[in-house]
Amino acid sequence: MLPILFSPDATSWENFGLGVLVDAISCEAEENRNGSYELELTYPISGAHFADIALRCLVVAKPNYTDDPQPFRIYNISKPLNGIVTINAQHISYDLSKNVCMPFSVVASSTACNTALQGLKTNAVETCPFTFWTDVDTVASYSQS
């Protein structure tokens, strides 16, 4: 699968976004267990979509032959060297790591797990574009401080 470029605010990957990066020289994702999940893309400045590539844009690519395509957010674009830039992107899940959550608590009930997850979303300092769900039905209390 060729990598596809999307605008920073895209939430669906079911189209070709800003365009397919057919001119990409290489595109490799690296996932370390309990560690980083990053993508490195090399692209020529003469490529059809070079002008569209910007910080915070999303690149959707297959991390390997078996997994589904995954979105990665661009955080670094190198200066051109011999007409080629190196683009670094982190998996979109890293967007959550910079979003602080205000304190809240959930009392024990049959919906405590889902209520706690919704509390994380509604009490986030910045708007959270992610949705949360679980099939865990454990009855327990939760407190975020």
Predicted feature locations:
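Assembly/oligomerization scaffold segments
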Residues: M1-V107
